[in-house]
Amino acid sequence: MSLFKKAADAVDAGGIKGIYENVYFDRRTRVLTNCVGKMIPENAKVLDIGCGNGQISSMIVAGRPGIDIKGVDIMKRKEKCFIPVEVFDGEHIPYEDNSFDTALFVDVLHHIPDPMIILHEAARVARKCIVIKDHNADRFLGDITLQFMDWVGNARYGVVLEYNYLKRAQWEAAFSELGLTVSEYNNSLHLYPGPVDWIFGRSLQFVCRLDMRN
């Protein structure tokens, strides 16, 4: 068993998962709804890729009348889905070119061994832009910090944890290869309350909007 896994099990015995569910999860949902929603164009038709139960997208729609969002995921959640969801194979999006104004990824790409495959697909189906919420691994002990957060937040749902965290320069190289321009970027999300953000925040999380080059 890895040192990381031992540490994660130890803190779980102290109720960290319960704290995550009761305090952090609700705050994260509210903050991400605001940060992500602001980057989506007015009256956009959006595809949420890897949408889970679609809760964040449904909250964006509630606060931004005129936006329409549907989702795709590799499995459909047993619990309630808040938006229409279609199951797909994780690599081939089942829509024609330019079917949507915007493609959306919220904490999805670091779970994929080769995110470029699905990013190419997102660029194919989106006419205007791609909005991404994900992680930067640039900071001191960034990888370990992100692994811990990922495990606490996702392991209990059976999510495959690839721990595939890129540094900002790697993200920018990927976007350039896809012919995308970063038009908006925010790495001060403040997902965590108070001093906790000094440890788990510190620019490890970002939201960006990528526009298609003409």
Model regions and ranges:
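Class I SAM-dependent methyltransferase Rossmann-like catalytic core
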Residues: 5-31
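C-terminal alpha-helical "lid/dimerization" subdomain adjacent to the S-adenosyl-L-methionine
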Residues: 58, 135-195
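A conserved beta-strand element that flanks and buttresses the S-adenosyl-L-methionine
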Residues: 104
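Class I SAM-dependent methyltransferase SAM/SAH-binding core
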Residues: 53-92
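Conserved class I S-adenosyl-L-methionine
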Residues: 43-52
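Conserved beta-strand signature within the Rossmann-like core of class I S-adenosyl-L-methionine
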Residues: 128-135
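Short catalytic micro-motifs in class I SAM-dependent methyltransferases
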Residues: 107-111
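A short, conserved alpha-helix within the catalytic core of class I
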Residues: 112-121
